[in-house]
């Protein structure tokens, strides 16, 4: 039997977890940090830089997925899957992501649907309005 002191000591020695868990993130902070160091974007990379970068990547990914799901649900009654087309439509319709990714070409995304005003069909006016009175 463990004494109460030993039990309290064991409970306080919980495993601390990784940096992602400490920061409350899903994206791997360690992997992002190693990729930052390997890419040689700067001579030195601080510990908080990897956490911040992972948080930004996680936020942008969540935002992109949320908008893509909305775009897919607007296209079909029951959205079954996200395609590059729905991601492209979501990015181009959102103001902030559109500005951020304005020079990015998404593979298999297609183009934004737009119709030139000159090519749009003109509605015919009613027959009564077109008829001229005979004199």
UniProtKB/Swiss-Prot annotation:
Major place of residence: nucleus
Transmembrane portions of the chain: none
UniProt GO MF annotations: DNA binding; protein heterodimerization activity; structural constituent of chromatin
Localization terms from the record: Nucleus; Chromosome
Any one GO cellular component localisation term in the record: nucleus
Family membership noted in the UniProt record: Belongs to the histone H2A family.
Function: Core component of nucleosome. Nucleosomes wrap and compact DNA into chromatin, limiting DNA accessibility to the cellular machineries which require DNA as a template. Histones thereby play a central role in transcription regulation, DNA repair, DNA replication and chromosomal stability. DNA accessibility is regulated via a complex set of post-translational modifications of histones, also called histone code, and nucleosome remodeling.
UniProt name for this protein: Histone H2A
Organism: Trypanosoma cruzi
Organism ancestry: Eukaryota, Discoba, Euglenozoa, Kinetoplastea, Metakinetoplastina
């Amino acid at each position: 039997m463990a004494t109460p002191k030993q039990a309290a000591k064991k409970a306080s020695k919980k495993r601390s977890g990784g940096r992602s868990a400490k920061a409350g993130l899903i994206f791997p902070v360690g992997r992002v940090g190693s990729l930052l160091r390997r890419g040689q974007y700067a001579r030195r990379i601080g510990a908080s830089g990897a956490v911040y970068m992972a948080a930004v990547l996680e936020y942008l990914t969540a935002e992109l997925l949320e908008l893509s799901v909305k775009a897919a649900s607007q296209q079909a009654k029951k959205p079954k899957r996200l395609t590059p087309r729905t991601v492209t439509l979501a990015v181009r319709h959102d103001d902030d992501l559109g500005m951020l990714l304005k020079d990015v070409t998404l593979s298999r995304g297609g183009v934004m649907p737009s119709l030139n005003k000159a090519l749009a069909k003109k509605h015919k006016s009613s027959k009564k309005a077109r008829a001229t009175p005979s004199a």
